[in-house]
């Protein structure tokens, strides 16, 4: 393997839109373990550039799409334990609802998921409609926001002021509405958009651009 990362828990369409099979690995690019020697020897950068040209630069999730579209297709990517890239969505949903929400073709191990949330090695503060803002933004409710601020206070950036919440009105409305919806209704509604509507829209856009 030339690249390892944590499974991003995405539906089949996110893979097939990249030319992958539904069961192929699809990893998140937040934390990566790279075999640099193999990377250079096999000219992976050139492969990436060729893939970008072939798709006119229009690739879902940009660099994440490129790395999966190239290396997963070659069978050169592997999966790490989720504790090494414990994403915000892991904290926002329990395992059962995360699988219902994302509908991955090959669900990750539930015990590993629970272990990651309980004892993460690396916390990835990513965007998530349920916890939309990061800990350097005023009002963050992430369970590790306090820990982040404790380490920030010990860093050279301790005097850097907190950023304001600059989400758009629709983004804030989505966060509020989904927080008051019944859990099952919210999960099924967002799942339909996430696994069907968004990938379909991206696929149509890419076809038009080609």
Identify what each model region corresponds to.
Residues 17-19, 109:
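Eukaryotic intrinsically disordered and solvent-exposed regulatory patches
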Residues 1-17:
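Conserved donor-nucleotide/metal-binding helix-loop-beta segment in metal-dependent transferases, i.e.
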Residues 29, 34-210:
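A glycosyltransferase accessory/donor-loop signature
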Residues 20-31:
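A recurrent flexible, glycine/aromatic-enriched loop bordering the glycosyltransferase active site
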């Amino acid at each position: 393997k030339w690249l390892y990362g944590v499974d991003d828990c995405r539906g089949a369409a996110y893979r097939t839109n990249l030319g992958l099979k539904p069961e192929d690995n699809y990893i998140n690019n937040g934390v990566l373990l790279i075999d640099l020697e193999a990377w250079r020897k096999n000219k992976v950068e050139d492969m990436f550039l060729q893939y970008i040209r072939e798709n006119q630069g229009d690739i879902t999730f940009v660099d994440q799409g490129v790395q999966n579209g190239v290396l997963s297709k070659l069978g050169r990517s592997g999966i790490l334990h989720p504790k090494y890239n414990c994403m915000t969505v892991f904290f926002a949903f329990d395992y059962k609802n995360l699988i219902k929400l994302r509908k991955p073709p090959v669900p990750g191990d539930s015990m590993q998921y629970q272990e990651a949330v309980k004892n993460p090695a690396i916390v990835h503060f990513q965007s998530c409609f349920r916890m939309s803002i990061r800990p350097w933004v005023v009002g963050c409710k992430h369970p590790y926001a306090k820990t982040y601020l404790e380490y920030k206070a010990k860093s050279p950036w301790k005097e850097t002021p907190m950023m304001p919440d600059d989400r758009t009105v629709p983004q804030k409305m989505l966060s509020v509405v989904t927080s008051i919806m019944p859990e099952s209704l919210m999960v099924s509604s967002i799942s339909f958009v996430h696994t069907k509507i968004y990938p379909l829209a991206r696929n149509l856009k890419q076809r038009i651009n080609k």
